[in-house]
Amino acid sequence: MHNLENTFANPIMLNDEGYQAPNNFLILGLGESGVAMAKWCLRNGAKVSLADTRAREQLSPRQLAWLGELEFAGLQAAHFGVFNDSLLANVEVIGISPGLSPIQEPTQSFLAQAQKEVIDIWSEIEFFARAIAAMGRTAKAHDGKYEPAILAVTGTNGKTTTTALTGRLCERAGKKVAVAGNISPAALDRLMSALDSADQIEDMPDIWVLELSSFQLLHTHSLNATAATILNLTQDHLDWHGDMQAYANAKAKIFGPNTICILNRNDPLVMGLISEAQKTDRSIVTFGSSRPDEQGAFGIEHDLRAGGIDWLVWAEVDEELEPQPKRRRKSVIVEDEPLRLKRLIPADALRIRGRHNALNALAALALARAAGLPMNMLLHGLRDYQGEPHRVQSIAIIEGVEYVDDSKGTNVGRVGPRQNR
């Protein structure tokens, strides 16, 4: 395996005269994501310090074990308790854990001071995005190639199911797949394990499927996923973000400049994240509970003639062509091609229950198609997927009554759709 070079570099600035990639990092938070960032930085020769708002005596045995591993790997310093500005001395980048709200003290004041000192603030996903770019450059420098598809999933509800299902579909299509992010493991942990097991960069995963929370996205700046979806938006985590607009803006950062945007057309908040001007420049695919209304879209069709069956359908595009959705054109009159709806699978044939899961399945299909995978292979994986624990999981049927574990239903937006199964 080749050594990565400039893994922390901004790809846009890499060739600028005098540009130097950062090499002095302060990691905030001794959790899974913070530890992954610290390990990645140390692995790549950076100077690393760590700070956590908890007292050392409050750390769990697992956290103490992590701390020991980091100190053995070369961690320069670890601070516990209230953040103070002296921690910023010589720091070029702060790596912030998703558990730390930027609007709550002491984090808010600390980050404000960091910005005054022109210190960058990165999420773990920003480290990941730069690492993937560095791997591509390294492979190219050795006459190789590494350009994996990155499929990203966010939304208030349905992230884990859609992420896991997308990974399953891609695997059934014969690809090497890594699933990581909010779903666990941390993206950098999965990246490090993949690097450790690969003989060369070309042996790395073909496709990365990432579940991303608004917490992770807020300080992500250079991710340019192949395709990404926002499944839905309802009020959640407002104590962390401050208000609904800030929450939505964080979610919207999942779309890079070249990302295929996969949008829930039945959710006005989701559709409102893409302006009319942007729609003329972006590749967009929609999914929803209605029949598709444009080429390449996904939806649900109710067939009264067949006893009221709901079908997952796709406004089919030519499988022989590269499956990139068409960009919408403004101020150009184009005669619409007649839609050719292809019935994919009855909704009742899915092993995951409920209309909301039918929408999750459509989003997963759209993501996998955006990665260039043939529909017929994806449908085999769709039929097999049994869902994730605690998400409308059938436990037993006793005397005609079905008992369901939906203990992950912790907000109104999550519970409501289950009652309309």
Region locations from a protein language model:
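N-terminal leader/targeting and accessory segments in enzymes
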Residues: 1-123, 127, 134, 353
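Short gly/ser/thr-rich secondary-structure transition/capping motifs
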Residues: 5-11, 73-81, 122-126, 185, ...
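Nucleotide phosphate-binding/pyrophosphate-handling subdomain across enzymes
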Residues: 16-24, 36-44, 344-421
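Active-site flanking residues adjacent to catalytic metal/cofactor-binding acidic residues
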Residues: 28, 51, 181, 210, ...
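Residues in the short beta-alpha loop(s) of Rossmann-like NAD(P)-binding domains
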Residues: 31, 54-56, 183, 267, ...
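Phosphate-binding loop of NTP-binding sites
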Residues: 40-43, 86-89, 98, 102-265, ...
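Extended acidic/charged loop-beta regions that coordinate divalent cations
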Residues: 85-87, 144, 197-239, 274-347, ...
